Swiss-Prot record:
This is DNA polymerase catalytic subunit. Residues 650-661, 676-691 have a biased composition (Basic and acidic residues). Belongs to the DNA polymerase type-B family. SMART domains: POLBc (SM00486). It comes from Human herpesvirus 1 (strain SC16).
Length: 1235
């Protein structure tokens, strides 16, 4: 440890001293534009020259914060490569010791203490208080009347812990002995940060009075309070020893359980509780036999719902409350947050300010970190738990969210760093701020400076790329595990706050994390991009090219150690790379404006933005239903064990399941796992997935009439099918009955719907008997959405964007209602409602089919309904037939009618069907008309819409797993089929005959152009000069490799090869590129070694990859006795490797000249073509492949390595002749030569 006096230094101290002396050596020319003119650093720390005494802590009142405002000793970890004067053998690894001095930062030749607050700071600061000292300018006393809220916090305060003199009596009463306080965080129109502490909010739950009185012998509400207090005092531990009946308040109210029509109103105890912990304990443990209602509702939700009009994101106004009471400003020394102004008030002091819609000047921070392994292997992927694996740079861009202006560019660098002049000039040319480079001796000082910026500047919104799964977890693990820094004071709260990242859990599909920071909303653009657009790769560079038409200067992870060790100039290259990543993410943020849509959802659902981002769809519907239920006199039961399956047995709750999770739909998952032994698909019915148990049969479809249809096909869509079914048939928990006697007094058909679902009769009363709560919600939401959309055309561009995000948010919540009822372990499940919706949907498809076939079977019948059809007659016989029905779409094949006429008449046809068959608001709409349609299978088709646009759905040629070559070739084939009339005619003739007939006869001549594309593709695949990049396939790493059931996957093979070669391994959710190579001796040896590596990694704990020194040697096998079938010499024939074992990293294949497996790629091309075009041959894939192969000449193509050996021996390639006679002469000459 470094001594505070002049004593000798320990080995750790000498290491740090060498790091410091090397770091502070005179530097070369500095980059321009980074503050004061370059100069030698003065007064730097060097333990050999000047001992440093311990800093004296300021005296004064007890500190009310837990962030670092002073520090005089810290753990010093720095890479030895910063010792630039040391010999090379001394520059490996890291210095690790303890240092007694204040943390330092250097910028442009100046030196400052990281934690010192004063004029001339190196980064912007917005906080008024720091370390208990008020730094506001003289006379600072802003008046706050109106403020915007973006986040809401809740905590419990105790009266004995507060200074009574600083609080009005009404606030002290609200927290005596304890009480929940809601804190609204926001900004005033002038840009002052404000925190409003709202006292008096109480959580509560319900219990049936009759059951409570019978079980507990209660005669009055006070008796119940005494029983609860006694139960808490007897609970294990000392948490509730001081609880008395005064902690509770109980009253008797009349409410109705929301489940089932026959449930009658009853008396309930409503129990008010002063703390969420007490509420949770009571609902889980107090009299388990008595059902609890709404015990899981948090204090923030209660605050929003119990005060009509209050929102989680919007403008508020302070006003006089009851008895003309006013909000009380807090003295700065009593602040609990890093705001400029704080108030105490009660809910009656608040009102919504409805006349304002613009956002105030919130700040957005966009950041990115660069890391480097610091152990013996610097190419290993860094692990936050390893002290030697370091964060070396952090880029930090600060934006004004309202103007989108980039205000500051900061680069935190471990070691000196000179940004390239070209980069500085580029930023200046774009009108962007000059970066401020902040340099540090050690990792702790850099991380502390970054967190100090976060605290002092306090951005309301934070973004980055994959920051939830990597950047934040890495930083927080470093700070808490390595440096033992408490983080509870680094959000908006000064202490006892939340600054935490945790895993939601590793679901079947992906590993996801979530972050919660008081007063800071983290929006990861990686998640936004993967939700919004479909790409073959979600690397930032690929996304930037696709979305921004921009690209970054990429820097390989393998190059970072060398660049970092090369000195300030090369570290500047890393800094440029780090800054440009943040710049691209900032552009993506303002391209998609995710905060607008998320805030609109949060406002509608009554939850804060963080819950909107991380807590799934369930909570959004639940809070809205909770609000409406209260207005209608209903209460919602706590659901654990509440809803029983068909067998009458309550399903057990999975340990890892969360009520608010839903299984994400991940395109490409099936294809990534179906190769070589992928898992079987479960049948329809009950299906258990991570956090989601669907206990009913899903929507069905009308089987497609596969083939190539060259007559017009009209597609009708049901508008908002499932929401409209719920509305039309009044479906709800509260309108459902499972008993016939419950509706016996009502008239069937008129007063209730009777329907059989899954072999059971269900009854739903009509709206005039009892209106469905779900229907009311949907009706109000859709009316709101319609009103918002009507305002968009008359709005300014800025307001139009906001309104569009609001209407999109409403649509998202509406579409969540059906799924909300169908999750068995959800917040409020009702599988009968979900199953009824899908049953009615299928009946609607069948009814539509029967009506169309009967009503418009003859052209005269069509004319009777639509006289204008006379002008749209086309040559040929007339018919109208439904060829496919898919959940909410119906495909109608119309022969003898023009596509133009059907397009014009489609809406009238849809309205006619809607009026004849369906209850409003269910309605059909004409979505499109195909002029040609290749209908392959369910959810798989390709068609050309009237007007020329091609639509492709569910077909392999557009899947992101295929390589570029196969995608291009498949697309060329499809374009020929649809846009070449000769090919289209031949294909239509092909599809009209049974596929077996074509095995014995030539294919139509019109397919020659089609065959020419296949011949050319075959030539390109076998061309030795081909571009390997055209043959790169990709697959998503959806979870850690050890979590895969099927290990025989190509992208997993490449993952382990990269690990063995010390290359950067992909992160979860990355797409891994690979090529399939030819089987050679070298490949076989690598596969054998890789098997050992997989076993080693499987034994590694947690998610940490095993770090072997090299590819392990294959296990020795016992010598086998040659069999009679073995070749001479006794050597056994090598086994044929699986395709997944032949996968290789494209960069490695190019660098080492590894030959591709041409047979695989042509088979893959034929496979993709067969899946697409098998509809031409009766969906018989085997016959399709056989017929497509007719176009390819039978030529033997030796492997590339064999070809090379033959050429080296003087042999040349001879192709087939143009005619059979020419080929015969060539073969004759060859045999004569060999003879």
């Amino acid at each position: 440890m470094f001594s505070g006096g002049g004593g000798p230094l320990s080995p750790g101290g000498k290491s740090a001293a060498r790091a410091a002396s090397g770091f502070f050596a005179p530097a070369g020319p500095r980059g321009a534009g980074r503050g004061p003119p370059p100069c030698l650093r003065q007064n730097f720390y060097n333990p050999y020259l000047a001992p440093v005494g311990t800093q004296q802590k300021p005296t004064g009142p007890t500190q009310r914060h837990t962030y670092y405002s002073e520090c005089d000793e810290f753990r010093f970890i720095a890479p030895r490569v910063l010792d630039e004067d040391a010999p090379p053998e001394k520059r490996a690894g890291v210095h690790d010791g303890h240092l007694k001095r204040a943390p330092k930062v250097y910028c442009g030749g100046d030196e400052r203490d990281v934690l010192r607050v004063g004029s001339g700071g190196f980064w912007p600061r917005r906080s008024r208080l720091w370390g208990g000292v008020d730094h506001a300018p003289a006379g600072f006393n802003p008046t706050v009347t109106v403020f915007h809220v973006y986040d809401i916090l809740e905590n419990v305060e105790h009266a004995y812990g507060m200074r009574a003199a600083q609080f009005h009596a009404r606030f002290m009463d609200a927290i005596t002995p304890t009480g929940t306080v809601i804190t609204l965080l926001g900004l005033t129109p002038e840009g002052h940060r404000v925190a409003v502490h709202v006292y008096g909010t109480r959580q509560y739950f319900y219990m049936n009075k009759e059951e409570v009185d019978r079980h507990l012998q209660c005669r009055a509400p006070r008796d119940l309070c005494e029983r609860m207090a006694a139960a808490l005092r007897e609970s294990p531990g000392a948490s509730f020893r001081g609880i008395s009946a005064d902690h509770f308040e109980a009253e008797v109210v009349e409410r109705t359980d929301v489940y089932y029509y026959e449930t009658r109103p009853a008396l309930f105890y409503r129990v008010y509780v002063r703390s969420g912990r007490v509420l949770s304990y009571l609902c889980d443990n107090f009299c388990p036999a008595i059902k609890k209602y709404e015990g899981g509702v948090d204090a923030t939700t209660r605050f929003i719902l119990d005060n009509p009009g209050f929102v989680t994101f919007g403008w508020y106004r302070l006003k006089p409350g009851r008895n003309n009471t006013l909000a009380q400003p807090r003295a700065p020394m009593a602040f609990g947050t890093s705001s400029d102004v704080e108030f105490n008030c009660t809910a009656d002091n608040l009102a919504i300010e409805g006349g304002m819609s613009d956002l105030p000047a919130y700040k957005l921070m966009c950041f990115d970190i660069e890391c480097k392994a610091g152990g013996e292997d610097e190419l290993a992927f860094p692990v936050a738990g390893h002290p030697e694996d370091l964060v070396i740079q952090i880029s930090c861009l600060l934006y004004d969210l309202s103007t989108t202006a980039l205000e500051h560019v900061l680069l935190f660098s471990l070691g000196s760093c000179d940004l390239p002049e070209s980069h500085l000039n580029e930023l200046a040319a774009r009108g962007l701020p000059t970066p401020v480079v902040l340099e540090f001796d050690s990792e702790f000082e850099m991380l502390l400076a970054f967190m100090t910026l976060v605290k002092q500047y306090g951005p309301e919104f934070v973004t980055g790329y994959n920051i939830i799964n990597f950047d934040w977890p890495f930083l927080l693990a470093k700070l808490t595990d390595i440096y033992k820094v408490p983080l509870d004071g680094y959000g908006r709260m000064n202490g006892r706050g939340v600054f935490r990242v945790w895993d939601i859990g590793q679901s079947h599909f992906q590993k996801r994390s979530k972050i919660k920071v008081n007063g800071m909303v983290s929006i990861d653009m990686y998640g936004i991009i993967t939700d919004k657009i479909k790409l073959s790769s979600y690397k930032l560079n690929a996304v930037a090219e696709a979305v921004l038409k921009d690209k970054k200067k990429d820097l390989s992870y393998r190059d970072i150690p060398a660049y970092y060790a090369a000195g300030p100039a090369q570290r500047g290259v890393i800094g440029e790379y780090c800054i440009q990543d943040s710049l691209l993410v900032g552009q993506l943020f303002f391209k998609f404006l995710p905060h607008l849509e998320l805030s609109a959802v949060a406002r509608l659902a009554g939850i804060n933005i963080t819950r909107t981002i991380y807590d799934g769809q369930q909570i959004r519907v639940f809070t809205c239903l909770l609000r409406l239920a209260d207005q209608k006199g209903f209460i919602l039961p706590d659901t654990q064990g509440r809803f029983r399956g068909a067998g009458g047995e309550a399903p057990k709750r999975p340990a890892a399941a969360r009520e608010d999770e839903e299984r994400p739909e991940e395109e490409g998952e099936d294809e990534d796992e179906r190769e070589e032994g992928g898992g079987e698909r479960e049948p329809d019915g009950a299906r258990e997935t991570a956090g989601r148990h669907v206990g009913y049969q899903g929507a069905r479809v009308l089987d497609p009439t596969s083939g190539f249809h060259v007559n017009p096909v009209v597609v009708f869509d049901f508008a908002s099918l499932y929401p409209s079914i719920i509305q039309a048939h009044n479906l709800c928990f509260s309108t459902l009955s499972l008993r016939a006697d419950a509706v016996a007094h009502l008239e069937a058909g008129k007063d209730y719907l009777e329907i059989e679902v899954g072999g059971r009769r269900l009854f739903f009363v009509k709206a005039h008997v009892r209106e469905s709560l779900l229907s009311i919600l949907l009706r109000d939401w859709l009316a709101m959405r319609k009103q918002i959309r009507s305002r968009i055309p008359q709005s300014s561009p800025e307001e139009a964007v906001l309104l569009d995000k609001q209407q999109a948010a409403i649509k998202v919540v509406c579409n969540s209602v059906y799924g909300f009822t169908g999750v068995q372990h959800g917040l409020l499940p009702c599988l009968h409602v979900a199953a009824t919706v899908t049953t009615i949907g299928r009946e609607m498809l069948l009814a539509t089919r029967e009506y169309v076939h009967a009503r418009w079977a003859a052209f005269e019948q069509l004319l009777a309904d639509f006289p204008e059809a006379a002008d749209m007659r086309a040559p040929g016989p007339y018919s109208m037939r439904i060829i496919y029905g898919d959940t909410d779409s119906i495909f109608v094949l119309c022969r003898g009618l023009t596509a133009a006429g059907l397009t014009a008449m489609g809406d009238k046809m849809a309205s006619h069907i809607s009026r004849a068959l369906f209850l409003p608001p269910i309605k059909l709409e004409c979505e499109k008309t195909f002029t040609k349609l290749l209908l392959i299978a369910k959810k798989k088709y390709i068609g050309v819409i009237y007007g020329g646009k091609m639509l492709i759905k569910g077909v392999d040629l557009v899947r992101k797993n295929n390589c570029a070559f196969i995608n291009r070739t498949s697309r060329a084939l499809v374009d020929l089929l649809f846009y070449d009339d000769t090919v289209s005619g031949a294909a239509a003739a092909l599809a009209e005959r049974p596929a077996e007939e074509w095995l014995a006869r030539p294919l139509p001549e019109g397919l020659q152009a089609f065959g020419a594309v296949l011949v050319d593709a075959h030539r390109r695949i076998t061309d030795p000069e081909r571009d390997i990049q055209d043959f790169v396939l990709t697959a998503e790493l959806s979870r850690h490799p050890r979590a895969y059931t099927n290990k025989r996957l190509a992208h997993l093979t490449v993952y382990y090869k990269l690990m063995a070669r010390r290359a950067q391994v992909p992160s979860i959710k990355d797409r891994i590129p690979y090529v399939i190579v030819a089987q050679t001796r070298e490949v076989e040896e690598t596969v054998a070694r890789l098997a050992a590596l997989r076993e080693l990694d499987a034994a590694a704990p947690g998610d940490e990859p095993a770090p072997p020194a090299a590819l392990p040697s294959p296990a020795k096998r016992p010598r086998e006795t040659p069999s009679p079938a073995d070749p001479p010499g006794g050597a056994s024939k090598p086994r044929k490797l699986l395709v997944s074992e032949l996968a290789e990293d494209p960069a490695y294949a190019i660098a080492h000249g590894v030959a591709l497996n041409t047979d695989y790629y042509f088979s893959h091309l034929l496979g993709a073509a067969c899946v697409t075009f098998k509809a031409l041959f009766g969906n018989n894939a085997k016959i399709t492949e056989s017929l497509l192969k007719r176009f390819i000449p039978e030529v033997w193509h030796p492997p590339d390595d064999v070809t090379a050996r033959l050429r080296a021996a003087g042999f040349g390639a001879v192709g087939a002749g143009a005619t059979a006679e020419e080929t015969r002469r060539m073969l004759h000459r060859a045999f004569d030569t060999l003879a």
